[in-house]
Amino acid sequence: EPKITNGDVVRSYFGLLVLGRTAYEEIELYRANGFFRRALGIRRVPSAETLRQRMDRAAGRFDIAIKEANAVLLGGAALTPVKTELGEYLPLDVDVSPFDNSKTHKEGVGRTYKGMDGYAPNFAYVGAEGYLLNCELRPGTQHCQKGTPEFLAETFALLARLT
């Protein structure tokens, strides 16, 4: 049994994300922080190396569970519809939003349709508030329509859980 459980690794990573930190190395800022540990119910905060290795090993395996949990959370939120003379409608905004990762050597970075090097993730936001319902990281070279029907089908299935 590992000294640092997979649960502690995942909770530590979620803790980083909630704090707006996305680099594995930033976990080092919280390794000796008792409040971080207690607030997340973690026995041991992993090192940056352990966090990176475990998350890389689990790549993609948590995607469905995370999206389902997000849908459950959003199902409890008061989503504001858009009112028109024909009735109320829950807005769903879907967009490919290229990220500028110029001068990096990250895997998947490529020339986007905006003419910069980066990724071309797809996002789906719901409600007038614009809560994130679904997302998909895509290589920068991927055409914006490739995989879109599948992304929309997944998004509509998640949306059905909210309404």
Language-model-detected regions and their locations in the chain:
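Active-site-proximal, Lys/Arg-enriched surface segment
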Residues: 52-124
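Basic, short loop/linker segments at the boundary and entry of helix-turn-helix/winged-helix-like folds
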Residues: 1-12, 146
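Short, conserved catalytic/metal-binding motifs centered on acidic residues
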Residues: 12-13, 27, 47, 51, ...
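Major-groove recognition helix of helix-turn-helix-like DNA-binding domains
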Residues: 40-57
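DNA-recognition alpha helix
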Residues: 24-39
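Electropositive, glycine- and tryptophan-enriched low-complexity nucleic-acid-binding patches
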Residues: 112-163
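Short capping segments at the starts of secondary-structure elements
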Residues: 17-23
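Short acidic, glycine/serine/threonine-rich loops at helix termini
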Residues: 39-40, 102-108, 133-137
